[in-house]
Amino acid sequence: MIGRIAGVLLEKNPPHLLVDCNGVGYEVDVPMSTFYNLPSTGERVVLLTQMIVREDAHLLYGFGTAEERSTFRELLKISGIGARMALAVLSGMSVHELAQTVTMQDAARLTRVPGIGKKTAERLLLELKGKIGADLGAMAGAASASDHASDILNALLALGYSEKEALAAVKNVPAGTGVSEGIKLALKALSKG
């Protein structure tokens, strides 16, 4: 599976990207939240990815943050929610807005996302209750542990650690720690664990 992609951004046509990785062009679909934060074409881009293999296609979905990818994966576990619908949800609201919506059980807010009706919204709320909030709570704890938590987390993911291991390690990094020192502290915590 392809879990991360780094290369030169060749094309941007919402929500599709073409990323050149050493001469190989990868087509990647991204949520609009990631799309709006992309660099200009011709510049280097790094995306966390989720590869989906279907009978008729191999599809690659890209995300700017680990929490977006984790939420995408949770959405895919829900019956009747495919990759396109999950991408639409993440394009229609941020991960934190989705977590608030799930916590408040606000089906009306979810129905504003194109393609989601009342029944689908209710199923999403039921299935995500207790899952998405727990993930975000862990990530919020990691983010408060360091000003550079996202960069440290992405570095650990790039080194092959699981999201769970990386989040636990980032929690041990004191606030105000720089990225390189934070990575060292996180790696030290991982080696002890």
UniProtKB/Swiss-Prot annotation:
It is found in: Cytoplasm. One of its GO terms (biological process) is DNA recombination. Residues 144-193 are annotated as: Domain III. CDD domains: UBA_RuvA_C. One of its GO terms (molecular function) is ATP binding. Residues 139-143 are annotated as: Flexible linker. The RuvA-RuvB-RuvC complex processes Holliday junction (HJ) DNA during genetic recombination and DNA repair, while the RuvA-RuvB complex plays an important role in the rescue of blocked DNA replication forks via replication fork reversal (RFR). RuvA specifically binds to HJ cruciform DNA, conferring on it an open structure. The RuvB hexamer acts as an ATP-dependent pump, pulling dsDNA into and through the RuvAB complex. HJ branch migration allows RuvC to scan DNA until it finds its consensus sequence, where it cleaves and resolves the cruciform DNA. Has three domains with a flexible linker between the domains II and III and assumes an 'L' shape. Domain III is highly mobile and contacts RuvB. Belongs to the RuvA family. This is Holliday junction branch migration complex subunit RuvA.
